[in-house]
Design a protein with these regions (language model features):
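Membrane-embedded transmembrane helical bundles of large multi-pass transporters/channels
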Residues: 1-42, 136-392, 498-699
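Disordered, low-complexity segments in secreted/periplasmic proteins that are enriched in proline
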Residues: 4, 52-53, 399-402, 692
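A short small-residue
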Residues: 44-46, 82, 128, 296-299
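Structured non-transmembrane domains adjacent to transmembrane bundles in polytopic membrane proteins
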Residues: 48, 57-79, 86-169, 391-566, ...
């Protein structure tokens, strides 16, 4: 069969311009990647991953960070050196601590000499350490923290840990810096395994995977350009999501195109003719779905959080680069390789596709027999699962933001146990210098404040370091921060605790603005594409229900099963945007086919069941690939990525196998022509027309 396919390729090889076009496309892509490659490699250099980098410019804690740059020495890096021994520190332990902290002071320019703060039970001593030498240079900050950790050592029962905001930021930088390689390799491996299983070919799976890699490189270069040209915020989270989207969405588009191309090869003598027919057949649906996804993602530009606002265009770039590569480079490579790339299941010109029993025909039949019962049961199930969202763990604390326990988190735990009546994480107040004395006095009399120290002055501002009585990131500390903001008119209150408060406030505000915007934009696009009001409303309602159910499953599993002790404030918004955009993406493929069947004269029930039978396999394969790529995030060392990956992966699976297969199909059967109201298809039956090639085949 392989020899016959090669002979056929020789007889049907395109000539003239058609023969040169694929080579020209490949050459153009090679040139683009050669130019874009250096910029792609620099994307990690422009990432920012501190909490303050995520906040809106108007936030009080953001103003504190900006003003600190104006103070002598610029922004400070604050650490807490923790010495602890169960049963109490010995004289030798205290001498070791004094010697090591003196070594830190001798090796670095500190704001003040380290001063011991013993715990009441005698088990712990902490030494606050602060320096302005690294400034805003993340590498210099991390190097400072690493050097301090090399200097202070425990042993023999003496525990030594380095905590504080500076250590937490350094540990976060290391985690984000280590994401790129493992994330990419794991994603590639997962997609490769799925493509091998879907295509059952030792060669074909390599082509879309390689093209997705090219698209990933291009997207990184484009995002680097957006950062340089338009100051788009790039974070480790947004970079990770972009990679997932390029491989997930790109592979989905490849599945649709390759499926149709395989089918057209049995009808066309030449590969380039088959590819042209395949692009005409599935291209409009792919373009429409990707445009809808990109439009939904770009709604994040309305977010107040700079991290979410940057996520929108970055994710949209990933989708559009994947689309561009899969509709240009992938067709060119497939045409050049000819039919033999499908070996051993080579499609032969003039052959008839094998008739196979369709699982989706059986599933559609069950939905079609009792559509109302299926629709109600599915709706009740999604609603019941959504109730689990009320069980989501509380807001994510810094100490719980890692899936492991780095040194900085261990230090915070030790401090919380040893100093129950004192915060180990100062609140930073910046007061106008001419009113600094009054601000200092007011701060000392504010309820919940344990102590206040005056710090640096410069640029018309004076820094006050406030220690709260309550532990960091507790309700008591938040009450103290609110009281300081109310009492100190004209001053700014910041620090890690205030940053977390501002992050949660901005996230809540963004949820109320971006969610309606996404729903409206997606609904309008669907109305234009489907020429109906009912079908778009049904699709949007379905994906919203999926989002609620996915969050509910997360609420049931995050803490009891996965051990996650907090919910990232941005989780509801980001998962909503992705699930609505990606869910509607699959809905477009299915409803586009239902509409085509109805326009050919099929009755509403026949149109719905035929659409499911002919597109179900590809949509299921695409859903599995996309869910698997997002599931890769659950293996990452950051709680925010684990939660996002889990919710989106579960949501995609629910959408693929419950909503698209049963609920949308049963709704189409139950509503009959009313599904297309007020369009023409809702009023007048269409006379049967000769059947055209299917829009989407099976994998």
């Amino acid at each position: 069969m392989r020899a016959a396919a090669q002979d056929e390729d020789q007889r049907t090889r395109p000539r003239g311009r058609w023969r040169m076009l694929p080579w020209a496309v490949v050459a153009l892509w090679a040139a683009v990647i050669a130019i874009a490659g250096p910029a792609a490699g620099k994307l990690g250099d422009v990432q920012v991953n501190r909490a303050v980098d995520y906040l809106p410019a108007s936030a009080d804690s953001t103003q504190v960070a900006k003003i600190q740059d104006m103070l002598p020495g610029g922004e400070s890096t604050d650490l807490v050196l923790v010495y602890h021994r169960d049963g109490g520190l010995t004289a030798a332990d205290r001498a070791t601590a004094a010697r090591q902290t003196a070594g830190v002071a001798a090796a670095h320019t500190l704001t003040a000499p380290p001063r011991a703060v013993p715990s009441e039970d005698g088990t712990t001593r902490m030494y606050p350490v602060s320096t302005t030498a690294p400034g805003q240079d993340d590498e210099a900050r991390t190097a400072f923290v690493d050097d301090v950790r090399e200097t202070v050592k425990g042993g023999g029962g003496l525990g030594v840990e380095v905590g504080g905001p500076g250590a937490l930021n350094a540990d976060a930088q290391k985690v984000y810096g280590s994401l790129g390689g493992p994330l990419l390799y794991t994603t590639v491996a997962v997609v490769a395994i799925l493509l091998i299983l879907i295509y059952r070919s030792p060669l074909l799976w390599l082509v879309p995977l390689a093209v997705a890699g090219v698209a990933d490189a291009l997207s990184m270069a484009v995002v680097h350009g957006l950062n340089r040209g338009f100051d788009v915020t790039v974070t480790g989270q947004s970079s990770a999501v972009m990679t997932i989207l390029v491989f997930g969405a790109g592979t989905d588009y490849a599945l649709l195109l390759v499926s149709r191309y395989r089918e057209e090869l049995t009808r066309a003598a030449r590969p380039h003719e088959a590819m042209a027919a395949a692009l005409r057949g599935c291209g409009p649906a792919v373009l429409a779905s990707s445009a809808t996804v990109a439009a939904g993602l770009l709604c994040l530009l309305a977010a107040d959080l700079t991290s979410s606002r940057g996520m929108g265009p970055i994710a949209a770039v990933g989708v559009l680069c994947a689309l561009l590569a899969m509709l240009t480079l992938l067709p060119a490579v497939l045409v050049l390789l000819g039919r033999r790339v499908f070996w051993p299941l080579v499609p032969v010109y003039g052959s008839e596709p094998k008739k196979r029993r369709s699982l989706f025909a059986a599933m559609g039949g069950s939905a079609g027999r009792r559509p109302v019962a299926v629709l109600v049961t599915g709706g009740v199930l999604l609603g019941a699962l959504s109730l689990g969202a009320f069980n989501l763990p509380g807001d994510l604390k810094q100490a719980d933001s890692f899936t492991s326990t780095p040194d900085s988190v261990a230090a915070m735990t030790t401090l919380a146990d040893a100093y129950p009546g004192r915060s180990s994480q100062p609140i930073t107040v910046l007061a106008p210098t001419d009113r600094a004395g009054a601000a200092l006095a007011k701060a000392r009399t504010t309820e919940g404040v344990a102590s206040v120290e005056r710090g640096r002055s410069g640029g018309g501002w004076t820094e006050l370091s406030v220690v709260a009585e309550a532990r960091p990131e507790t309700a008591g500390e938040r009450d103290t921060i609110r009281a300081l903001r109310e009492n100190l008119d004209g001053s700014h209150v910041g620090g890690p605790g205030a940053q977390q408060m501002d992050l949660e406030t901005a996230s809540s505000r963004d949820l109320g603005i971006v969610v309606p915007l996404v729903l409206l934009s997606v609904l309008l696009i669907l109305i234009v594409l489907l020429r109906s009001l009912v079908a778009p409303l049904l699709l949007v309602a379905a994906v919203v229900a999926v989002w609620g159910a996915s969050l509910g499953i997360g609420g049931l599993l995050f803490e009891p099963v996965l051990g996650l002790r907090g919910t990232d404030p941005g989780l509801p918004l980001l998962t909503f945007v992705f699930l609505v955009a990606l869910g509607v993406d699959y809905g477009i493929f299915l409803m586009h086919r239902v509409r085509e069947e109805a326009r050919r004269g099929a009755g509403p029930t026949e149109a719905a069941l035929t659409a499911l039978r002919t597109t179900g396999g590809v949509i299921a394969s695409a859903g599995l690939v996309l869910a698997a790529t997002f599931a890769v995030l659950t293996n990452m060392p950051l709680t925010s990525l684990v939660e996002m990956g889990f919710v989106i992966a579960v949501g995609v699976l629910l959408d693929t196998f419950l909503v698209r297969t049963y609920l949308v199909t049963s709704a189409s059967v139950a509503l009959q022509r009313r599904m297309w109201w007020p369009g023409a298809l809702s009023r007048t039956p269409v006379a049967p027309a000769p059947r055209e090639p299917e829009l989407v085949g099976t994998p």
